[in-house]
């Protein structure tokens, strides 16, 4: 049992060492399991031979035991018939067979012990091989994953300089430019419409105010006065006031009206 324990440790150590040093862990692990399978086949053959020898020894033991019993019965028969010499000869044969059977009994006990040990060792080796296969599969999967990851990293590392990636980057920048241009055009179009409506609203307000001013002036009200304010009766024209004073008043009013129009136009 101790020998196979050491063998198992050596196998595991060699397996780990091969995995760490080999260029292709998958092939090395596969070969290691194949070698262990060959050892298992040899051990099974040894167990089979030991069991076969055990069976033959057991058969010989049974045969000699039966023969010894037969010669004992003959010795009894000879004594019953007064054949003492013949009985003595039969007992001598019985003793020889009994001694041989005792030797076979000892040999059989040893063979059974050896066979049992070999069976246990065989089961232990089978378990170790099963463990090695599981570990092999796990390590092979890890090796494949590491290889795939290395290839992926290499591919990703080369994407920065590849023409395909550069084309994607150019197209992305072009799409971004097109989106920005479209957004700017939309904003400008909206600004133009808003500006036109603002001008129309401002012009409408100015026209309304000018019309109101004209109406108030036609009614005799000055700008800024309330329509509800009572109008003073016009004083009688004094014939003594010179005519040029009326002309001057008209000129002042016209000037004020022109100034007001200019201010309205500047709004």
Curated annotation (Swiss-Prot):
Residue numbers spanned by region Disordered: 224-252
Record field: transmembrane = none
Q: Which GO terms describe its cellular component?
A: plasma membrane
User: Disruption effect?
Assistant: Essential, it cannot be completely disrupted. Cells with very low levels of protein have no ordered thylakoids, are barely green and are non-photosynthetic.
Superkingdom, taxonomy of origin: Bacteria
Coiled-coil portions = 26-156
Q: What subcellular compartments does it reside in?
A: Cell inner membrane
Membrane topology term? Peripheral membrane protein
Pfam families (UniProt xref): PspA_IM30 (PF04012)
- Report the principal subcellular site: membrane
Alphabetic keyword roster? Cell inner membrane, Cell membrane, Coiled coil, Membrane
The entry assigns this protein to a family as follows: Belongs to the PspA/Vipp/IM30 family.
Known function: Required for thylakoid formation.
**Protein name as it appears in the record:** Membrane-associated protein Vipp1
Q: What is the lineage of its organism?
A: Bacteria, Bacillati, Cyanobacteriota, Cyanophyceae, Synechococcales
């Amino acid at each position: 049992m101790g020998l196979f324990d050491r063998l198992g440790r050596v196998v595991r150590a060699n397996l780990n060492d091969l995995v760490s040093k080999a260029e292709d862990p998958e092939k090395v692990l596969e070969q290691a399991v194949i070698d262990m399978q060959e050892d298992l086949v040899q051990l099974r053959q040894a167990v089979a031979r030991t069991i076969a020898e055990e069976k033959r020894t057991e058969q010989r033991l049974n045969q000699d035991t039966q023969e010894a019993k037969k010669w004992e019965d003959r010795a009894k028969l000879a004594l019953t018939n007064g054949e003492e010499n013949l009985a003595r000869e039969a007992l001598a044969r019985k003793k020889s067979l009994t001694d041989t059977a005792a030797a076979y009994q000892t040999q059989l006990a040893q063979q059974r012990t050896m066979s049992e040990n070999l069976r246990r060792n065989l089961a232990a080796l089978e378990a170790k091989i099963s463990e090695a296969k599981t570990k092999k599969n796990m390590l092979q999967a890890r090796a494949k994953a590491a290889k795939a990851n290395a290839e992926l990293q290499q591919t990703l590392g080369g994407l920065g300089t590849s023409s395909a990636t550069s084309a994607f980057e150019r197209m992305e920048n072009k799409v971004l430019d097109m989106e920005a241009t479209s957004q700017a055009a939309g904003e400008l179009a909206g600004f133009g419409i808003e500006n036109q409506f603002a001008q129309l609203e401002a012009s409408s307000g100015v026209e309304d105010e000018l019309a109101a001013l004209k109406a108030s002036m036609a009614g005799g009200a000055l700008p800024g006065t309330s329509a509800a304010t009572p109008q003073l009766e016009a004083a009688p024209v004094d014939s003594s006031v010179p005519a040029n004073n009326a002309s001057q008043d008209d000129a002042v009013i016209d000037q004020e009206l022109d100034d007001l129009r200019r201010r309205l136009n500047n709004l």
